[in-house]
UniProtKB/Swiss-Prot annotation:
Main location class: endoplasmic reticulum
A GO molecular-function descriptor: N6-threonylcarbomyladenosine methylthiotransferase activity
Disulfide bridges in this chain: none
GO BP annotations, alphabetical order: maintenance of translational fidelity; tRNA methylthiolation
InterPro entries: Elp3/MiaA/NifB-like_rSAM, Methylthiotransferase, Methylthiotransferase_CS, Methylthiotransferase_N, Methylthiotransferase_N_sf, MiaB-like_arc_euk, rSAM, rSAM_horseshoe
Domain (TRAM): residue spans on this chain: 430-492
Origin superkingdom: Eukaryota
Compartments reported by the entry: Endoplasmic reticulum membrane
Presence of the UniProt keyword Endoplasmic reticulum in the record: yes
Name of this chain's protein: Threonylcarbamoyladenosine tRNA methylthiotransferase
Stretches assigned to the MTTase N-terminal domain: 63-171
Cofactor comment text: Binds 2 [4Fe-4S] clusters. One cluster is coordinated with 3 cysteines and an exchangeable S-adenosyl-L-methionine.
Gene3D superfamilies per record: Methylthiotransferase, N-terminal domain, tm_1862 like domain
Origin species: Mus musculus
Amino acid sequence: MPSASCDVLLDDIEDIISQEDSKPQDRQFSRKHVFPKVRRRNTQKYLQEEPRPPSDSTIPGIQKIWIRTWGCSHNNSDGEYMAGQLAAYGYKITENASDADLWLLNSCTVKNPAEDHFRNSIKKAQEENKKVVLAGCVPQAQPRQDYLKGLSIIGVQQIDRVVEVVEETIKGHSVRLLGQKKDNGKRLGGARLDLPKIRKNPLIEIISINTGCLNACTYCKTKHARGNLASYPIDELVERAKQSFQEGVCEIWLTSEDTGAYGRDIGTDLPTLLWKLVEVIPEGAMLRLGMTNPPYILEHLEEMAKILNHPRVYAFLHIPVQSASDSVLMDMKREYCVADFKRVVDFLKEKVPGITIATDIICGFPGETDQDFQETVKLVEEYKFPSLFINQFYPRPGTPAAKAEQVPAHVKKQRTKDLSRVFHSYNPYDHKIGERQQVLVTEESFDSKFYVAHNRFYEQVLVPKNPAFMGKMVEVDIYESGKHFLKGQPVSETRVYTPSISKPLAKGEVSGLTKEFRNRLGNHPNGTSDTCPATQHGSAYSRMVLQMSQYDCALKVATGLALLALLLHFWPDSLLTM
């Protein structure tokens, strides 16, 4: 663990001084007039205590790093960016936690269980004597929690400085970068979109179009971490999408805390962005739109319906309702009523036939009565949502909802079970059997028995494992359905179709290593040169050469002192007393 602890929130790492450094008065003390005192019995000490070359564990840039991410797509994108930067600087990203020298734990603050897993991982890392760097919404929102003391933290808007934090942590320092990025006093969306990254799936690019939101939901802790809305400019988002397609990506996910609010802070809106993006989506690729709250999409229903009907945009939208009780929604400060939600869903179902609407529901929010809950049950029974995320309410520290009178735990648990039972009482895909569909194959199933594809409505379709299908559009006949999936058999005369998509990067390969970025690395004291691949430890090697040269110098000094001691040892005492 770090040898120095620091709970001060810093703007720059340069302000850190390790406990191993000399004290100021020691550094200023001059020894030029001091003659070494000779002790004959300790003559061999000079030879025995020679300086040693630095060990691999303290030379930044050559260690193995394990990255664990919890939470939403936005958080996963942040994790991919941090992995890419670390790999570009010479670190080895490993999937083996026990083999790693440092753990980078990227947290989620939405639910208590996610934070519990995060806390347990910190404890395990400490037990295994791993270096630790913390990231994500938990330490950003509450950096002074007891279990975070003495640990390095990288803020959600500072992920472009992850290399600095990791390097200092490896040296034994505890550093924290939690500030917001601003330009002329205006808050920026966060780190640059053109940073290198390692995609968890080389075929899928996750693009955060904005950070933060405009709401103040009484149960939400994420707002404490991500802050108010800050949108990325359209041209930067379009450029990132184009670069992704050039690297073989065939599916783009747009994500944020609320995609529907995009652009309100920079004088634009979500439909304007989407129309620009569909212009650059190649044939054979698809775009998936992330979560949007009802109030903001209400203003753009006509345009959104047109976009969701586009052949290269999934007819899918995630619209959280949270409760079907207006009184509960008011207590949540959700800024809409149930009628608004129904209006959005009904309009899109009419204008975008077959559209998939996913939603979220919280069971047992403070003040929720049995009647309130029954209203929510009726909503699920009416719309039969094919994708429903049911969450038992957990009070998050520091939120208004945590201070309210709580629904008894056993009641919350029972309501969660009851709603889950309603959800599992219907199968939304039975009517799809016998259909012929075009699907995009992007990954392997968890049990490794199938490839996972998605149809036009972002419904999961399992297909046979044929390597020729991966990353391609394939035509299949649907022959089976389950609660969360369909199964498709490729049509015998089908042709694999993706003529306009480049060959994807290999798994674990760093994306975004443009010439401009390589030049920036070359100018950085710890960077990789333009001619050195990211997989080589160029920066680490140069630092090791420097430290070894310092070691050689120290060795020469020690040898000189030892010879001087020997000379004085055999020198006649009479000459010393003259």
